[in-house]
Amino acid sequence: MNKNPIYRSEEEAKNIACGNVAAELDENSQALDAINGAGWKQTIVCTIAQGTVGCLVSYGLGNGGYCCTYTVECSKTCNK
């Protein structure tokens, strides 16, 4: 029996507990394509909305106009 799950035959895949790994990966990629296939317009709108919400939360937490991350380099500039 081949140890690489991708290269197993159909008969070998039926005899293992996890089933056909290649078929499962294909199903997962199809599901991700369906989720991510909303179109570029919706993606742009979501990106702008998430950025706006992030800036509003940052401002609400006391950040005076800068959108910063938790990195050490940025934290020093945000505390001014």
Curated annotation (Swiss-Prot):
Modification after translation is described as: The lanthionine formed by Ser-58 and Cys-68 forms a putative lipid II binding motif.
**What name does this protein carry?**
Lantibiotic Flvalpha.b
Q: Give the subcellular location.
A: Secreted
Annotated Gene Ontology cellular components are:
extracellular region
Which GO terms of type biological process are on file?
defense response to bacterium; killing of cells of another organism
What's the name of its gene? FlvA1.B
Q: Principal localization? A: secreted
Q: Does the keyword Ubl conjugation apply?
A: no
